């Protein structure tokens, strides 16, 4: 993506606006990103960012509950929202001539969400039901336990969806205070991509957003995760169909100089993914090392790695679903062996070239749709800077085989790892 075509504009109230014209189709997308996620939650209020996201689909005086669904569908558009560790985002993708509708919706709910008590209680039920559905998946139990074990000081310790005890206790006032604190123009990024003229669309942005008042300074963030002092292990025993293994290593944030080599390492192990780092969790690249070593040999039903960008140091993880004739301990050994091979022998130039080609294909795919372009720009702006979209491409292209070996030796060590096993209880195996 050429940043020459991305324009940055900041309103007096602090709202950052990124625009990119894309005239290949008569479509435009409107995204608003807030710099708030589970990273900004304290004990007792876990899951509150995700719950607030739900509440913003429950109406304002201008757009009552249910109207949003109808008006966007009537105009041939799509919409959604999501919450992650470091951010919350909302979007509407519409025919280009109806982009103004997205601006109306997002400027309105930035300040006018109702948080009606009856809707708070309804969403409490919805969110708890979502949590219970999440807990029905063994891999989620294991992942939550591994991450909680990996982090002792940083709020990344907590699941984005929250703990049930907190979801039962959070009040309407808690939710509204969180909303009033973080949903302000000076804590938001508006990203517009599509078939429009920049000057004209900026006039509309100023019409809808310029009069919104900025918020007070955000609560300070002090948490720093201490360096790990040795391997930790956790075992989860619950109903399930098969044993699972997750190995997580504390790894650098996305602004670190070693981020690009670690992205390449992830691609070597599991295949390239888009620079939005969305998706994952299933094996898609049959030539990747983990697939060849664990799936082709019928040790595991799937085996993947994952390394996603985060504002603060998070994890580089390996996951595998064990075939019923094998044990988690065998799969752990096989996963660690693949890491040790890279640490000891490195990777070949040809392997790096293959991964580079895969990454270029994923990047090209990311640029195909206006929604993906906005996702890419917004993700990187809230984590670091939208300019990283260009610089990261250059960083990835500059990675050498010895860089991949070095980061494997530096970060994927016993000292920095948490090993998790999921062992099905006997009753679930019949």
Label each region the model flagged.
Residues 195:
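Carbohydrate-associated surface elements
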